[in-house]
C-alpha cells in the first residue's frame, strides 16, 4: 500500500504542476483551465482550444515548459489518477472526477503555503502575471487581449498601468534626470 501512495502522490504532483504551468503559460481563467477537454489539447502544435466567457473559443499557445508537463501528465499520471475510470476532461481530481474551480483554488492555497508565500495567492494572480509579463516585454496590447479572451480592449488596458509604473521606476533608477 505504501508504494501505491507514493506513486499516487507523484502522479497528483505532476497533475498539479501541469495545471500551474498551463495556467501561467496561457493566462487562463480558472473556469477555462478546469474545463479543458482532451480533444482541445493539440500537443503537436503546442496550442489549446479554450472556451471562454460567452462560449467564445480561442487558440492559445502553451509554451515549451507547459507542453512538457502536459506530456508527462498524459503519458502515465492521468491514467493512474483515473484508475480505470474515463473522463473527457484533461484534469481530473484524485478520485477521477472533473476538477472544479474550488478544488483548484485549494491547490493554489496549499502550494502557496508550502512555498512560504505569505501574500494572498489566487489563480487570478497568475493570469495577471501572464498579462503583465507580456506587456512588460513588449507584446502588442491587441495580442494580449486575444490571448486573455477579452472582448473589450479596455479590460486589457488595466495591465498597461502596471507597465507604465514599471517604466517610471526604471526611468527614475537609471536616468540622470529621473
Question: Which residues does each predicted region cover?
Answer:
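Conserved catalytic core of the tyrosine transesterase superfamily
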Residues: 3-4, 8-178
